[in-house]
Amino acid sequence: MPKKNKPAAKGPFYFFMMEFKEQEEAAGYRFSGLAEVTEKAGPHWEKLAPHEREPYNQRAKQNKANPKEAGGYGERYTAQGKPFSQVQAEAAKRRQLEEQIQKRIVEMIQTASANNALGELEVYFVSCNYFCVSLSGEYVPAELAIIKYSLNDGVMDSLNVLINPTDLPLGMALDAKTHSSSTHQLPVPPDALGEANYEKILRQILKFFKNTSGSKVVPPIFTWNKDIPMVDSILRGILEATDLDYVKFSILPLIDFFYNLKLATEDYGLDIKTFPSIHLAKALLEKDVYAYTAGIACDVHEQLNNQVACALSRVVRWAYVISDSCCLDVGIEMEKGRHLPHNMTTLSDITGTVSALSSRMSKLTTTSDNNRSKMSRPRSTDRTDRDVTTTTIYSSRAGTVTGKPSTIVPQQPASSGGTRAANDTFNTTNPFYAMQMAQSANRSPTKKNPWSRENKLTEVRDPQSDTETSMLMLAPVAGRGRGTLARMNAAGRGRAQDLCTTVKTVGRGHLN
């Protein structure tokens, strides 16, 4: 078995490069790989005096003399040829960086809460769109959006910039076109929209942060947790393309900020905790209930009807979700367009609606006695009505008949029982409440079902004579189903010869 080649010993520059990398990352700078670290650390190494290089020379000698302790020879490697010690060191550093970020967010919110200024805490949300990712891991920018936000004022200010990178990395045109068509739908270079001068873009960003004095201090900006590498790469690319390399951006996770802010507002206004973990904050942001809100995207995406993928719309929607969850805990009334969309209903809208309804109800008058009497009168069951006070007869069968007003006489029952007498009070004003007319030229007989409940009750109240009953028993009825026996003509109850008439039918028989 051939012997495994030993890796080359680490020189003084390697240890200086690792130290330089740690210092830059602690300041918020992110490197894409060791090649970039080597390129950045080289000029600084050349400027070091011999006595400044001595500590690194000693570390290189120690690494060569005792490689196992120094992480040199005899060490295990990953499949990519990376030492396990380096992998573990990077993982430990990431955990340390995450702890520092968490500590920074918690201290920021706790300080504002202790000073009773949680509503005045101003933060910045940022989101970006990109065309493609190069082979070195660099993101080619397409759009950048930043908003200024606080619980009291909601969305205070916004900045939206479309970025034109002019050129794409070699071989990335198809990737850029595919990604653009499936997300933000912005034209790809060389037809891209927006600003191509990166220095001008950076000055707009610094002006938005109110940082024009050359200071390195820039407020922390929050973005979606998984988008931190993308946002960091885009901002770093803008910085590298300009001479304003003194600025250091600090990009923090939005979900962690939302979770800690919600805990602080609950401590202020609630006794019961409703946020058990950070996963609930993530779920609320991922649900994105304001995704299709109109009027919060940039003009280009409004014309494309693709508001969901707009970077400006995205950061505004984050602000709406946080406001909807936290403002009521601290008693902050939400305003349309700042805390919620313009078409949302706020508490003040509900209060105004209730006040208007109460005012309108107070103006209503009670029903007059005359109207009450009209409402209490029974409606006639007949389909022909007459206005007693006029000469007009309103009929649903014969239309309108004009004549002299006459006295309404209730119809008396015939010898065979007759109909019930009309004993109700007549309405002298409304023709639609008139009683049954005793004399009507256009009146036609009404057919009734002899087997109905109404007819049975009539027979009980007005029993038939023995002769008519015997004749009814002799009347044969042919057919199947339900038969209808109408024993009524223009003079009242039917005669014997009418009752004996036989009608043969199929289905439901009718005997007239």
Swiss-Prot record:
Stored InterPro entries: HMG_box_dom, HMG_box_dom_sf, Maelstrom, Protein_maelstrom
Places the protein is found: Cytoplasm; Nucleus
PANTHER family: PROTEIN MAELSTROM HOMOLOG
Keyword ATP-binding among UniProt keywords: no
GO terms classed as biological process: cell differentiation; male meiotic nuclear division; negative regulation of DNA-templated transcription; piRNA processing; regulation of miRNA-mediated gene silencing; spermatogenesis
Matches recorded under CDD domains: HMG-box_MAEL (cd21992)
Lineage: Eukaryota, Metazoa, Ecdysozoa, Arthropoda, Hexapoda
Record feature DNA-binding region, as residue ranges: 9-75
This protein's record includes keyword Transferase: no
Recorded name of the encoding gene: mael
Family per record: Belongs to the maelstrom family.
Disordered as annotated region, ranges: 49-72, 360-421, 439-465
Regions of compositional bias (Polar residues) in chain numbering: 360-370, 393-421, 439-449
Protein name as it appears in the record: Protein maelstrom homolog
Basic and acidic residues biased stretches: 379-388, 451-464
Role summary: Plays a central role during gametogenesis by repressing transposable elements and preventing their mobilization, which is essential for the germline integrity. Probably acts via the piRNA metabolic process, which mediates the repression of transposable elements during meiosis by forming complexes composed of piRNAs and Piwi proteins and governs the repression of transposons.
GO CC aspect terms: nucleus; P granule
A GO term for molecular function: sequence-specific DNA binding
